[in-house]
Amino acid sequence: MGNTDYWNEAIGHISSRDPILSRIVEAYPEPKLSPHGDVVRTLIKSVVGQQISVQAADATWERMVALMGGVDPGRIYETDIMSLRGCGLSMRKAEYISGIAEMWERGALNVNWDELEESEVRERLLPIRGVGPWTVDMVLIFSLGFQDVLPLGDVGLLRAVENNYSGGKKLTLEEVRGIADPWRPYRTVATWYLWRTIDAEPVNY
C-alpha cells in the first residue's frame, strides 16, 4: 500500500513557494490523502467515473454495489454485461470493467505495484482497454500514493487552477504546467488541495 509519509514536508514545501496554495492548505486542513493500495479497485472506479460528473459516478457506483452486494473484480467477473449496463454504465464502460475483471481473474494484474516506478506503472496499465492517462494518474494518486503526479486530464483540477490563478479565465495545459512547476516534487499534494476548493468532500478513487 502506498503511504504519505511525505505529506507534512510537502505542505511546507508548496506553502512556502506558492502563497495561493498556502491559503488553500490553511482553509482545508483535513483530511489528507490516504492511499489504499488497491490498484484494481481504482481502475474500475476510474473507468466508471470517466467523462461524467462526480455525482453521476457515485450514483452508478451505488447501483453496482446494490446489484452485486459490493464492487470487486470477482463479483464483476461473474456479472453479465447487460446487468452492468442496468447500473447506468455505457456498453463500452461495461465492457472495459468486465475486461479488467477478467485480467484480474487470470492473474494478469497480480503485480507488486509498490515496487514499480511511476513510468513502469504507466507502461503496465496504459495498454489495458479503457485505461488512459487520467485513469493511470488516479491509480498513482489514490492507490499507490506517488507524490508528484499532476493529472492534466482532470477537468476538476484544471477548473480549480483557473478559479484560483486566472480568475476563471481558460488556461492552456502549458500554462497550468508552468503554474504547477514550483510545486515539484509534491504536485500530488497540491492537486489534492486544489480539488478541495471545488469539492470540499474528497473524492476517493
Question: Which residue stretches match the model-derived regions?
Answer:
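Hydrophobic (often cysteine-bearing) scaffold residues that line and stabilize catalytic clefts
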Residues: 36, 40, 44, 53-57, ...
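Alpha-helical ds-nucleic-acid-binding substructure associated with the helix-hairpin-helix region
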Residues: 20, 24, 52-53, 57-129, ...
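Alpha-helical scaffolds flanking conserved acidic
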Residues: 8, 38-42, 78-79, 121-122, ...
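C-terminal accessory module of base-excision DNA glycosylases/AP lyases that mediates lesion recognition
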Residues: 1-31, 95, 118, 133-205
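Amphipathic alpha-helical segments that form the core helices of the histone-fold
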Residues: 43-45, 84, 180
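Short N-terminal amphipathic alpha-helix/helix-capping patch enriched in small hydrophobics
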Residues: 10, 17, 39-44, 60
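Buried hydrophobic packing segments
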Residues: 44, 97-100, 161
